[in-house]
């Protein structure tokens, strides 16, 4: 199987290339917080020689509660993203939820993300594809890895081949997620070699069946990330926060920002080791 290369700025994202870290925070809480978090990621990834893309949402449109914080909105969020690009020279990924958001967001950021809950919405998929931007498709929690090929085909039919696929866990009964480690290579195959990345922090979500906010298992983020990186992936998708207990969204799953360097160092070591091995074809 040939591995496709998707270019994001000067970064080559591919399953057989050194992994790219797609890291940041869940939602833009403020301009100052975004600057602080991005600066830390840039410092760590530059030190370790890891390709890096900043991630955050300007609007968490799928919060469970009407009272939950959603973010600064598109207009203010794009201003913050532009300042991050100007200050740190980073590439940026963010999600869109509405057709009208696709074009203006793609004019500022480098990757637009199709949210898991919206991945079957054909009109949105087509609007995103027609921007020509790189698209990161989150695998819905309710969809099998093999079904991701249909979403890639929709995007390709619109003339866009710049697709990254991302696993963020699969429903395991009610209010819980599990990661199918066999699914990563299935997604590689059905997409004919698209880069596949792993959203480790969202995969750690678990819920109170009657609560409005997601719980999480950040004490297990390292072991789950190690498992995913051992597959040989194009990238790792990670959320970190300087004070996870007081984060405005998904704090229980977020890596403490103070642990970032140690964490990324381990992921790089695993990635380097796994990709130094000769591939063994066990199909025959």
UniProtKB/Swiss-Prot annotation:
The lineage of its organism: Bacteria, Pseudomonadati, Pseudomonadota, Gammaproteobacteria, Pasteurellales. Its EC number is 2.5.1.55. The keyword Cytoplasm applies. GO terms for biological process: keto-3-deoxy-D-manno-octulosonic acid biosynthetic process. This is 2-dehydro-3-deoxyphosphooctonate aldolase. Pathway: Carbohydrate biosynthesis; 3-deoxy-D-manno-octulosonate biosynthesis; 3-deoxy-D-manno-octulosonate from D-ribulose 5-phosphate: step 2/3; Bacterial outer membrane biogenesis; lipopolysaccharide biosynthesis. It catalyses: D-arabinose 5-phosphate + phosphoenolpyruvate + H2O = 3-deoxy-alpha-D-manno-2-octulosonate-8-phosphate + phosphate. It is an enzyme of class 2 (transferase). GO terms for cellular component: cytoplasm. Keywords: Cytoplasm, Lipopolysaccharide biosynthesis, Transferase. Disulfide bonds: none annotated. It is found in: Cytoplasm. The keyword tRNA-binding does not apply. Transmembrane segments: none annotated. Belongs to the KdsA family. One of its GO terms (molecular function) is 3-deoxy-8-phosphooctulonate synthase activity. Its main location: cytoplasm.
